[in-house]
Design a protein with these regions (language model features):
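Proline-centered linker/hinge motifs at extracellular inter-domain junctions
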Residues: 122-137, 162
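Low-complexity "stalk/linker" and mucin-like segments enriched in Ser/Thr/Pro/Ala/Gly
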Residues: 131-138, 168-194
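Exposed beta-strand face motif in extracellular beta-rich ectodomains
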Residues: 199-203
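Extracellular and select intracellular beta-sandwich modules with Ser/Thr-enriched
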Residues: 214-221
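Single conserved hydrophobic/aromatic residue that forms the stacking wall/gate
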Residues: 1-13
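Short, solvent-exposed loop/turn segments at the edges of extracellular beta-sandwich modules
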Residues: 208-214
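Short, solvent-exposed loop/linker segments at the N-terminal edge
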Residues: 139-145
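Acidic, Ser/Thr
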Residues: 150-158, 167-169
Length: 226
């Protein structure tokens, strides 16, 4: 079940990828008896973010929910209590955007898994690309150092074409200033480490294939500025 609590502008996303026609086409109809049994007799409530970090998509949120990922980006408040953080949506803090930003990728992933239920050959369904980088994913770096981000080991098991996107996950790290990334949409990108000693910078490789549906995988690079 993909059940999420949507409010305000998020309903626009639901109209496209979470309404009954989408579920009928991509999940319930023609995808075997298990998918056909998916009920639509209630309002999606929001337990899904608790489960989504268990899907190994490269964001490593299963190791620490506060890293942010398909399960949103919860923060500890008042001891052990957790609540949604605020990710920036068009420059404005929005606690709902911590999960909303991932919805298209989540829904496509679900649709692909439904296709697996009825594909009698591996080649008749799409599968997630594999995001890999050269070097360590957690590094200690110095201010002013040039860092090469190389995703050339990445591949797609279906031989689909891949698109690369590097971006700074500002809310997950403690470096809040925007860091310039050169060659942001290429396999090999680079940055200059900002002058923020004692801070942590999170960079995400977002890898997208051109299969049907488009599927994404990720690789998180954490730079600890010394």
């Amino acid at each position: 079940e993909i059940g999420v609590r949507l409010v305000g502008s998020e309903m626009c996303i639901r109209d496209r990828i979470m309404d009954k026609p989408w579920l009928a086409d991509h999940i319930k109809n023609g995808h075997g008896p298990l998918c056909a049994a998916y009920p639509q007799e209630y309002t999606s409530e929001g337990d899904t973010p608790s489960f989504m970090p268990l899907i190994r998509n490269g964001l490593e949120q299963h190791t620490d929910y506060t890293l942010g990922g398909w399960g949103g980006r919860p923060e500890y408040k008042n001891g052990n209590h957790m609540q949604d953080g605020n990710d920036l949506k068009n420059g404005v803090p929005d606690s709902h955007y911590t999960f909303q930003r991932w919805l298209p990728a989540i829904q496509n992933d679900w649709a692909a898994r439904a296709d697996w239920c009825v594909a009698d050959e591996y080649s008749k369904a799409n599968h997630q690309p594999v995001a890999r980088i050269l070097g360590e994913s957690v590094r200690t770096v110095r201010p002013g150092e040039k860092i090469i981000l190389d995703a050339s080991p990445s591949f797609d098991p279906d031989k689909n074409s891949l698109s690369y996107q590097w971006w700074q996950y500002r809310e997950a790290g403690s470096v809040q200033t925007k860091v310039a990334i050169k060659h942001v949409d290429e396999k090999r990108a680079e940055i200059i480490v900002p002058d923020n000693p004692g801070k942590q910078l999170h960079l995400i490789l977002e890898l997208t294939d051109n299969g049907t549906p488009n599927l994404k995988s990720y690789k998180r690079v954490i730079l600890n500025v010394n």
